[in-house]
A protein has these predicted regions:
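Phosphate/diphosphate-binding glycine-rich loops and adjacent basic-rich segments that engage nucleotide
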Residues: 193-261
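A generic, well-ordered mixed alpha/beta core segment in the N-terminal half of proteins
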Residues: 125-215
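Intrinsically disordered, low-complexity segments enriched in small polar residues
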Residues: 7, 13-16
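Catalytic-core signal marking the mid-to-C-terminal active-site face
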Residues: 51-52, 57, 296-383
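Active-site cofactor/substrate anionic-group-binding motifs, chiefly glycine-
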Residues: 94-147
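Small-residue-enriched flexible segments
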Residues: 231-292, 309
């Protein structure tokens, strides 16, 4: 069961910044479209922000992507992922990512009208060729087939290839977990991480995600970079003028730094020393060469500097607890829930608790989008 604010397609007439007839609420009473069109109106108070509903966030993302020529079948999955990220207080993968997406569309590096193609390679192994488009569209095509294959065979794998990946992996796993399947996801991120003991970048942030289905409770999903922190978080800290904690990054000379800009010019470090470094190397291999995709370092050589998502595939693996335990005197769900119950007795937070709580708040109160970010979006709207 997924506990999240739904970001369904916006019905006709709903208040939306895509619709000139209605606007989302702002605490200062200003019209956010005017804020975007008249950027001098952005600075109204300390840390000014615009309150938007989840549907309005999705609609705004769609408006910007469409205005830059991205086809709806490409833009829709991206907008939904951004809305889900904003709702979950995952700002590093929310509207902020519009800047990079638009950069790649305008540079021509990504095919704005790419039609992903699903291929059943062998048995329960599936592949979606993204046709040089964005990964969310490839994911939308492939996941229903992955779910069906896993339910029929017990386990199935899906490789997303020839695409550009920017979105959070937990969002990629949500529909699989909702279908009652356990699942993994791996993707190679932008090459910016030095191996443990190294002094220059070699690997991507290389996130790993896992999901476990639950009945009558919020699903168990974790998603974390194998670097000490995601690159997007470093970028946002730099924008906010915040220093990095020790152990997150090194500068171009390989020396420790607390400055976000220096870490972005140098390298991030893996979490957990040699353990995080080894996991990152694993992701490089199974989400790179194993599925016919480049390593992050090889992909970096093809990057044109437009600020958009890196070229890189994704490997998803789905497993059916029903099939795995078929014929056994074993209630997999009861055993798992007993495990979670024991964890709760220690008053611990489970992975994804924070996201679930944020989604509930966002569904009731909307989300706050920085006016400084809205000001930057002015350049993303042609004319």
């Amino acid at each position: 069961m997924r506990c999240k604010a739904q970001s369904a397609a916006m019905p006709v007439g709903i208040a939306s910044i895509c619709n000139a007839a209605a606007r989302p609420y702002r605490a200062d009473g200003a019209d956010p479209i005017s804020v975007i069109q008249r950027t001098e109106a952005c600075v109204v108070a300390a840390e000014p922000s615009t309150v938007m509903s989840i549907a309005e966030v999705e609609a705004f993302a769609m408006r910007v992507l469409r205005a830059n020529g991205l086809a709806d079948h490409q833009a829709g999955p991206i907008a939904r992922a951004m809305a889900a990220s904003e709702a979950s207080a995952c700002r590093s993968h929310g509207l902020y990512r519009l800047i990079g997406y638009v950069g790649s569309i305008r540079s021509g590096r990504v095919s704005a009208r790419a039609q992903p193609r699903l291929e059943r390679v062998a048995g329960s192994f599936l592949r979606v060729d993204g046709q040089n488009g964005f990964a969310p569209a490839a994911h939308a095509i492939g996941v229903p087939a992955l779910i069906e294959a896993a339910k029929n065979n017990g386990i199935a794998a899906l490789a997303l290839t020839h695409c550009y990946h920017f979105s959070a992996l937990w969002h990629d796993l949500d529909p699989i977990v909702d279908a009652g399947l356990a699942c993994w996801a791996f993707t190679v991120g932008q090459c910016i991480v030095a191996p443990h003991g190294g002094n220059r970048r070699l690997m991507g942030t290389n996130p790993i995600a896992f999901g476990w289905p639950r009945v009558g409770a919020c699903s168990f999903v974790f998603d974390f970079a194998t670097s000490a922190v995601a690159r997007g978080e470093i970028e946002l800290m730099g924008r906010a003028g915040k220093a990095l904690p020790p152990g997150w990054g090194i500068d171009a000379a390989g020396q420790p730094t607390l400055e976000p800009a220096q870490a972005l010019a140098g390298a991030l470090l893996p979490f957990g020393g040699h353990k995080g470094s080894a996991l990152s190397m694993m992701v490089e291999l199974i989400a790179g060469p194993l599925i016919g995709e480049p390593t992050s370092r090889a992909a970096a050589a093809l990057d044109n500097g437009d600020g958009g998502p890196p070229l890189g595939g994704e490997l998803l693996i789905a497993m059916s607890p029903e099939v795995f335990t078929s014929g056994l005197m074993h209630d997999w769900h009861e055993q798992a829930e007993c495990f979670f119950s024991e964890a709760r007795k220690q008053d611990v937070r489970l992975p994804s608790d924070r996201r679930h709580e944020a989604r509930q708040r966002s569904e009731q109160n909307g989300v706050e989008v920085s006016d400084a970010l809205l000001k930057e979006f002015a350049s993303l709207l042609p004319g």
